Amino acid sequence: MPTRTISISEEAYERLKSLKTSEKDSFSDVILKYYPRKRKLSEVLAEIGSNPELADAIEKASRDMRKAKMRNVDLDAGA
């Protein structure tokens, strides 16, 4: 596997080092553990299980975003 060299502050290095669970862990292991690939919302929801309050909040946010996109704003009106 190819490697890359990055510069990080001493504080960032110490934080990463403190997250290693064993001497065998690499910094790549730590980074991948705490910053996994992007997941689909459906994967996250399946993992946390049923949560009606969260479902209602997501539905409301989705409706609000659609309404905001449909609004036609005339930016030249004040010119």
UniProtKB/Swiss-Prot annotation:
Annotated keywords: Toxin-antitoxin system
Database matches in NCBIfam families: PRK13696.1-1
Superkingdom of source: Archaea
Protein name: Putative antitoxin MM_2475
Organism encoding this protein: Methanosarcina mazei (strain ATCC BAA-159 / DSM 3647 / Goe1 / Go1 / JCM 11833 / OCM 88) (Methanosarcina frisia)
Described function: Possibly the antitoxin component of a type II toxin-antitoxin (TA) system.
Family from the record: Belongs to the UPF0330 family.
